[in-house]
C-alpha cells in the first residue's frame, strides 16, 4: 500500500510539473507576440516602417527602423527552427504587414507556429 501511495504521489507531481512547463512555454510565446505587437504599435506611433528579419535556427530577430535605428531582439528560451513564406516582416505606419506567412518557434521541447495575417497586421500562434 505504501508503494502504491508513493507511486501515485510521484505521478501526480510529475503531471503538475509537465503542465507547469507547458504553461511556462506558452507564456514565453505570448511574450514574443506581445513584443511583435509592440513593434507594430511603435511603427504606428512614430509614423515609420519597422522591418523584422527572421533567420532559421536563430534566437535573434533583427529589427530595422525606417528612421535608421538597427538592433537585435532576443527570443527568450526559444529559437526559430523554420521560416515559411516570410523572411522579413514589415509593419508600415498604418500597422499592416507587408506579406503573410509563418515561422516555427521551438521553446524547450514544444513547437509553435507563429502566424502573420496580412489584414490589419494580426499575429497569432498555434501549438504544433
Residue ranges and their predicted role:
Residues 1-15:
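N-terminal single-pass transmembrane signal-anchor helix
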Amino acid at each position: 500500500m505504501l508503494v502504491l501511495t508513493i507511486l501515485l504521489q510521484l505521478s501526480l507531481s510529475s503531471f503538475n510539473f509537465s503542465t507547469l512547463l507547458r504553461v511556462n512555454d506558452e507564456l514565453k510565446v505570448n511574450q514574443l507576440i506581445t513584443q511583435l505587437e509592440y513593434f507594430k504599435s511603435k511603427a504606428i506611433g512614430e509614423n515609420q516602417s519597422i522591418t523584422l528579419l527572421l533567420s532559421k535556427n536563430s534566437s535573434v530577430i533583427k529589427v530595422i527602423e525606417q528612421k535608421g535605428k538597427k538592433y537585435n531582439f532576443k527570443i527568450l528560451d526559444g529559437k526559430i527552427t523554420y521560416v515559411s513564406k516570410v523572411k522579413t516582416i514589415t509593419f508600415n505606419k498604418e500597422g499592416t504587414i507587408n506579406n503573410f506567412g509563418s515561422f516555427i518557434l521551438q521553446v524547450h521541447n514544444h513547437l509553435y507556429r507563429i502566424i502573420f495575417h496580412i489584414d490589419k497586421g494580426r499575429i497569432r500562434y498555434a501549438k504544433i
